[in-house]
Amino acid sequence: MNKKPTKDKANGAKATKTIALNKRARHEYHLEERYEAGLALQGWEIKAIRAGRANIVDGYAYVRSGEIYLIGAQITPLIQASTHTVPVERRDRKLLLHRAEIDKVLTRVEREGYTLVPTALYWSSNKVKLEIALAKGKQNHDKRDAAKERDWQRDKQRVMRRHNRDA
């Protein structure tokens, strides 16, 4: 009896479930290249993430001795989950990337002034993954331009709906 492997979604895409998003990153940075990285986590952190106690809004990534670490992301521990260890909510967590990706990111960060910003934390086939993006900070006038563009798109949609409804 050969059993065909089942696919989670159409076209072989894996099902992912978002744990946390960093919407502020889109507002404060010009996001360019995105990378998917694994996280080196402890057991209590996985339990807390399953309970939805993760926050990546204040986080950023940096390169230290050829490895990339996530700083400032908060995983609030469950009271009953960690009895034998002392949990640290905002500890540095190692990101797992291929060496070629680390080298590419390292050159862009050091030479071109980019920042590594976490944009999403999600499950991918029972593993926690972090999406990080190479980003450059926006100036205040860039933020205002983006807000004007959003308002214009919203007004345009409103006018089109009203026009289509009346016709």
UniProtKB/Swiss-Prot annotation:
Record's subcellular location: Cytoplasm
CDD domains, A to Z: SmpB
GO molecular function, one term: RNA binding
Keyword tags: Cytoplasm, RNA-binding
Tree of life domain: Bacteria
UniProt feature, compositional bias: Basic and acidic residues: 139-158
Region entry Disordered, spans: 139-167
Keyword Nucleus among record annotations: no
Record carries keyword RNA-binding: yes
Annotated GO biological process: trans-translation
Gene Ontology cellular component annotations, sorted alphabetically: cytosol
Family that this chain belongs to: Belongs to the SmpB family.
Family matches, as HAMAP family: SmpB (MF_00023)
Function per UniProt: Required for rescue of stalled ribosomes mediated by trans-translation. Binds to transfer-messenger RNA (tmRNA), required for stable association of tmRNA with ribosomes. tmRNA and SmpB together mimic tRNA shape, replacing the anticodon stem-loop with SmpB. tmRNA is encoded by the ssrA gene; the 2 termini fold to resemble tRNA(Ala) and it encodes a 'tag peptide', a short internal open reading frame. During trans-translation Ala-aminoacylated tmRNA acts like a tRNA, entering the A-site of stalled ribosomes, displacing the stalled mRNA.
Protein's UniProt name: SsrA-binding protein
Gene that this polypeptide is encoded by: smpB
